[in-house]
């Protein structure tokens, strides 16, 4: 799925966040582990790598709930994303300018403490901070959570733009199925930790079961997907 936007869909408790944390190797920090199967990144098994090693390989996760450093300014938050880079100040400054190009709101608020910015600006900051690591793949956990609809659309538009222009791969976990399928190339629907359906975004959007259970377009009485 390199160079694409892939959505993990499903309700609360479906296993979306756990899947992301398994990929980024943050699961071990919560005393979890992958007990079956393999996780491969360009042919390399990554289950035993540390989160820092994953970042070095270009995989960065944006956690649910934004998690900006409240006492730091927006720009200071962004620069923490470049902590592991070794390519010099000029390259980091160029990356910062690129982030500001994609997120002009952040340029305007660059000197503001993150605690005093809006939820949308904090989400943009969290994504921008991930981009400062020069990732090949970004894992986004519930990017729409707690945001006004117009801000959600703005965030997804930027994600799509980054994907198309910078060729960054996005794996996102999202409960807003309608929005996710509008911008994703393909998706997987999870229930109780299992994949119950997969396909292109167009295929999933037109599927009658998906319409009923996840897009709110059905009138059936069934209580589970399968």
Where do the PLM segments sit?
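Glycine-rich phosphate-binding loops of nucleotide-dependent enzymes
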Residues: 1-226
């Amino acid at each position: 799925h390199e160079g694409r936007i892939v959505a993990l869909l499903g309700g609360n408790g479906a296993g979306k966040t756990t899947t992301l944390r398994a990929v980024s190797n943050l699961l071990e920090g919560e005393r979890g582990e992958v007990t079956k199967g393999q996780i491969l990144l360009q042919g390399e098994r990554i289950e035993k790598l540390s989160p820092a090693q994953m970042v070095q390989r270009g995989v960065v996760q944006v956690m649910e709930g934004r998690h900006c450093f409240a006492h730091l300014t927006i720009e200071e938050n962004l620069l923490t994303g470049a902590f592991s880079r070794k390519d010099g100040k000029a390259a980091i400054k160029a990356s910062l300018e690129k982030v500001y190009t994609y997120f002009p709101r952040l340029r305007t608020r660059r000197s503001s403490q993150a605690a005093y910015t809006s939820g949308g600006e904090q989400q943009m900051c969290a994504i921008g901070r991930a981009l400062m690591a020069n990732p090949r793949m970004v894992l986004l956990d519930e990017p729409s959570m707690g945001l006004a609809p117009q801000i959600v659309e703005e965030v997804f538009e930027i994600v799509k733009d980054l994907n198309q222009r910078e060729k960054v791969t996005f794996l996102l976990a999202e409960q807003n199925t309608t929005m996710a399928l509008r911008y994703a190339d393909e998706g997987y629907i999870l229930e109780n930790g299992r994949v119950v359906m997969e396909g292109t975004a167009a295929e999933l959007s037109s599927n009658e079961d998906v319409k009923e259970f996840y897009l709110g377009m059905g009138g059936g009485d069934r209580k589970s997907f399968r």
